UniProtKB/Swiss-Prot annotation:
Gene Ontology, cellular component aspect: cytosol; intermediate filament
The name this protein goes by in its record: Keratin-associated protein 19-5
InterPro entries: KRTAP_type8/19/20/21/22, KRTAP_type_19
Transmembrane parts of this sequence: none
Matching Pfam families: KRTAP
Keywords in alphabetical order: Keratin, Repeat
Region (14 X 2 AA repeats of G-[YCGS]): 5-56
Gene behind this protein: Krtap19-5
Span of the signal peptide: none
Family: Belongs to the KRTAP type 19 family.
Role played: In the hair cortex, hair keratin intermediate filaments are embedded in an interfilamentous matrix, consisting of hair keratin-associated proteins (KRTAP), which are essential for the formation of a rigid and resistant hair shaft through their extensive disulfide bond cross-linking with abundant cysteine residues of hair keratins. The matrix proteins include the high-sulfur and high-glycine-tyrosine keratins.
Tissue: Expressed in skin during two hair growth cycles. Expression restricted to the cortical cells of hair follicles, appearing first in the cortical cells processing the flat nuclei located a few cells above the dermal papilla.
Subunit structure: Interacts with hair keratins.
Length: 62
């Protein structure tokens, strides 16, 4: 599975994005949750990064 995520996911709206938009797939981030993708999903691939909007996640990994 490929998690590219969307801009909305990167902002932590909790919406799973799709397509190579270069941001992240957030899961309730910004509300103290955690998910895939940091605020800037282009930073690092497959490595755990802190989410700028709260929680933990992985920036854009394949």
């Amino acid at each position: 599975m490929s998690y590219y995520g969307s801009y909305y996911g990167g902002l932590g709206s909790g919406i799973r994005g799709f397509g190579n938009l270069g941001y992240g797939y957030g899961c309730g981030c910004g509300f103290g949750g955690y998910g895939y993708g940091s605020g800037y999903g282009r930073y690092g691939y497959g490595y755990p990064r802190p989410l700028y909007y709260g929680g933990y996640g992985f920036s854009r990994f394949y």
